[in-house]
């Protein structure tokens, strides 16, 4: 009897302990939810106040300039300390100091090389920074200097890459030598930019070419008609809309659209031929792409070499400066509350990946 009573008492105590635990956990969750809600509410108020205060202020970026010679020097010194013994290090240090002293005494002024980067998406969004970087360097660059653009782009919108190319043309017009380095891809609009360089250097397996124009869009008119849905397209002007997504496309509209593509292609060919007259433009303007090895034979590039190799060589005889214009992020972008910005970047990211494979 006593053993049975003890077992029942322990069972009741265990049951009470579990209930108390559940109640405590529920209260804790409720408290945590209230705390999170309060913190979020405070953040929303602070962000709103900051946004109202910053409204109307002009957002400006900042030009960042780094000397690449220091980077290469650090790599060299790191290798020296890892490989050489104390005596060899001492001798190397003396030799470097002596060479620097002789250069200073002789009054030798090394030419400057301004290094830019362009990583292009469909909209050539990097043009926003490129235009300011070019404006900045042209205030200092001389015909004895050089501009090196490390270019990566599979192309995109005609007008966007037309503007990016026009920015590079400013360098040529100023009489400053322009070298284009391509490590992975410069196709379609990317090659439109590359051809402006006085010298084009590519990696052996970089993808180049795609001198052509493409446009594609779906048409759901028959689907809408099947479900008795009308979609009106009203225009003023015979060719205001040639092809549409929802309206009924006509053969006349298709012919006009194709004519516009051909016109754009001819302008593209003329632009490339203007800057690289050595090309057989009709032979290479077929929309095809070539790897660097084959592109060299067709004179699409002038030399096979990676950008790393080229810059390391130039660092031995010139002062290298890397320029990057960083756009000032808006408050919404910094806090991460702008869903439309995030969505836009997500879509552009995936379209760019597709673009790199199809070379629009």
Regions found by a protein language model. Name each.
Residues 190:
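DNA breakage-rejoining catalytic core of tyrosine-based enzymes
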């Amino acid at each position: 009897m006593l053993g049975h009573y003890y077992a029942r008492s322990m069972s009741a105590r265990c049951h009470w302990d579990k209930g108390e635990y559940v109640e405590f956990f529920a209260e804790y969750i409720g408290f945590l939810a209230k705390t999170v809600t309060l913190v979020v509410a405070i953040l929303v108020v602070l962000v709103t106040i900051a946004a109202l205060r910053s409204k109307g202020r002009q957002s400006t970026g900042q030009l960042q300039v780094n000397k690449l010679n220091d980077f290469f020097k650090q790599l060299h010194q790191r290798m020296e300390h890892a490989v050489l013994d104390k005596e060899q290090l001492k001798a190397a240090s003396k030799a470097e100091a002596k060479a620097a002293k002789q250069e200073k005494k002789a009054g030798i002024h090394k030419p400057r090389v301004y290094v830019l980067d362009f990583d292009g998406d469909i909209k050539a969004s990097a043009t926003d920074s490129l235009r300011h970087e070019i404006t900045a360097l042209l205030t200092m660059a001389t015909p004895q200097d050089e501009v090196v653009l490390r270019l990566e782009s599979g192309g995109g919108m005609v007008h966007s890459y037309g503007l990016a190319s026009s920015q590079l043309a400013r360098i040529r017009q100023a009489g400053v030598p322009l070298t284009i380095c391509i490590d992975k891809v410069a196709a379609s609009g990317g090659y439109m930019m590359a051809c402006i360089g006085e010298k084009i250097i590519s990696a052996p397996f970089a993808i180049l070419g795609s001198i052509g124009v493409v446009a594609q869009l779906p048409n759901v008119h028959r689907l809408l008609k099947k479900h008795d849905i009308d979609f009106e397209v009203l225009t003023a002007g015979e060719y205001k809309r040639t092809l549409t997504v929802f309206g009924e496309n006509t053969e006349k509209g298709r012919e006009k659209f194709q004519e516009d593509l051909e016109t754009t292609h001819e302008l593209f060919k003329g632009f490339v031929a203007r800057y690289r007259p050595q090309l057989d433009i009709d032979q290479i303007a077929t929309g095809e792409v070539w790897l660097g090895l084959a592109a060299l034979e067709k004179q699409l590039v002038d030399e096979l070499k990676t950008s790393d190799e080229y810059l390391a060589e130039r660092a031995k005889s010139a002062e290298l400066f890397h320029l990057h214009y960083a756009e000032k992020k808006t408050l919404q972008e910094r806090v991460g509350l702008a869903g439309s910005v995030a969505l836009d970047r997500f879509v552009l990211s995936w379209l760019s990946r597709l673009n790199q494979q199809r070379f629009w």
